[in-house]
From Swiss-Prot:
Pathway: Amino-acid degradation; L-histidine degradation into L-glutamate; L-glutamate from N-formimidoyl-L-glutamate (transferase route): step 1/1; One-carbon metabolism; tetrahydrofolate interconversion. It catalyses: (6S)-5-formyl-5,6,7,8-tetrahydrofolate + L-glutamate = N-formyl-L-glutamate + (6S)-5,6,7,8-tetrahydrofolate + H(+); 5-formimidoyltetrahydrofolate + L-glutamate = N-formimidoyl-L-glutamate + (6S)-5,6,7,8-tetrahydrofolate; (6S)-5-formyl-5,6,7,8-tetrahydrofolate + ATP = (6R)-5,10-methenyltetrahydrofolate + ADP + phosphate. The active site is at residue 86. Catalyzes the transfer of the formyl group from N-formylglutamate to tetrahydrofolate (THF) to yield 5-formyltetrahydrofolate (5-CHO-THF) and glutamate (Glu). The triglutamate form of 5-CHO-THF (5-CHO-THF-Glu3) can also be used as substrate. It can also catalyze the transfer of the formimino group from N-formiminoglutamate to tetrahydrofolate (THF) to yield 5-formiminotetrahydrofolate (5-NH=CH-THF) and glutamate (Glu). It can replace YgfA to catalyze the irreversible ATP-dependent transformation of 5-CHO-THF to form 5,10-methenyltetrahydrofolate (5,10-CH=THF). This is Glutamate formimidoyltransferase. One of its GO terms (biological process) is tetrahydrofolate interconversion. It is found in: Cytoplasm. Folate binds at residues 168-176. One of its GO terms (molecular function) is glutamate formimidoyltransferase activity.
Length: 301
């Protein structure tokens, strides 16, 4: 009998550490010996003091991997001492699980089981979000954690009905809280613009932001990055099939011209689907390339 097909998931946990690489290495080491785990990418950002690890594994191993990473992060990262530009709740800030060959329902079940164990075994408060939300308002991450509600504010808010965790205690330790959920593929994409004026950055970010009347399925924030002496427009594309990267870049360029600034550099945080890149290529090259014209795709499929 052939082996049962493994249901593959991707995980993209975000950790509140971007300055001490040894701590991130220990978090990665905690899952290296788990069967089927493949580390795909690491993005470390000292300004945001945040790291994003991308890995895949069979869905039957995601809970083991999640517990190991969250436990290790809790032992290494003290939120009382943490500072950084990016909003954050805890040592492991957010732990999304994305279906690859598994189904979304599979990922929802796995994420809730992970959340339950993190709460009961690690004694860390857990909020379920996106497709795994157990409270409707928590489907959107911004309704849980945002620039106005972070680790410091959560210390008191966690005792209220609105911020009662889905799992775990209603009090915070030095590891803070973790947000866990199943979600579709997301593209984290940043653009630096030629100004140090954060007010201009915020206006441009608002013009692009979906909830402010900009591009659908686009979430934006503006940060001043001291190391670059520039403003960064930080973006999450929650559905790249509805909101293409080229549309974002073109609209941002138009908005920049209103303030006599221009886009300087783009950066990708984590990984992106091949189809999203092909979409950008086809727009600018006026072509109709499909993935079966990509050499590496033909070789490895």
């Amino acid at each position: 009998m052939p082996d049962k097909e493994v249901k593959i998931v991707e995980a993209v946990p975000n950790f509140s550490e971007g300055r001490d690489i040894s701590k991130i290495e220990k978090i990665i080491d905690s899952i290296k010996n788990i069967e089927g785990v493949k580390i795909l990418d690491l993005n470390v950002d000292p300004q945001h003091n945040r790291s994003v690890i991308t890995f895949t594994c069979g869905i039957e191993r995601i809970i083991e991997a999640g517990i190991s990473m969250i436990k290790t992060a809790a032992s290494l990262i003290d939120m009382e001492k943490h500072s950084g530009l990016h909003p954050r709740f805890g040592a492991t800030d957010v732990f999304p699980i994305i279906p690859i060959t598994a189904s979304m329902d599979d990922c929802i079940i796995a994420s809730r089981n992970l959340g339950r164990l993190v709460g009961s075994e690690l004694n860390i408060p857990v909020y379920m979000y996106s497709e795994s939300a157990m409270v409707p308002e928590r489907r959107n991450l911004e309704n849980i954690r945002n620039k106005n509600v972070q680790y410091e504010e959560l210390k008191e808010l966690i005792k209220t009905d609105k911020y009662r965790p889905d799992f775990g205690p209603d009090s915070l330790g030095s590891a803070g809280a973790v947000i866990i959920g199943a979600r579709p593929a997301l593209i984290a994409y940043n653009i630096y613009i030629s100004t140090d004026d954060i007010k201009i950055g915020r206006r441009i970010a608002s013009a692009l932001r979906g909830r402010d009347g900009g591009l659908n399925t686009l979430k934006t924030l503006a940060f001043y990055i001291e190391a670059r002496k520039m403003v960064q427009i930080s973006m999450n594309i929650t559905d790249y099939k509805k909101t293409s990267i080229y549309k974002i870049f073109e609209l941002l360029s138009i908005e920049c011209r209103r303030y006599n600034v221009y886009p300087v550099e783009s950066e990708l945080i984590g990984l992106m689907p091949m189809d999203a890149l092909i979409d950008v290529f086809n727009y600018y090259m006026k072509s109709n390339i499909t993935r079966d014209k990509i050499l590496e795709y033909k070789i490895f499929t």
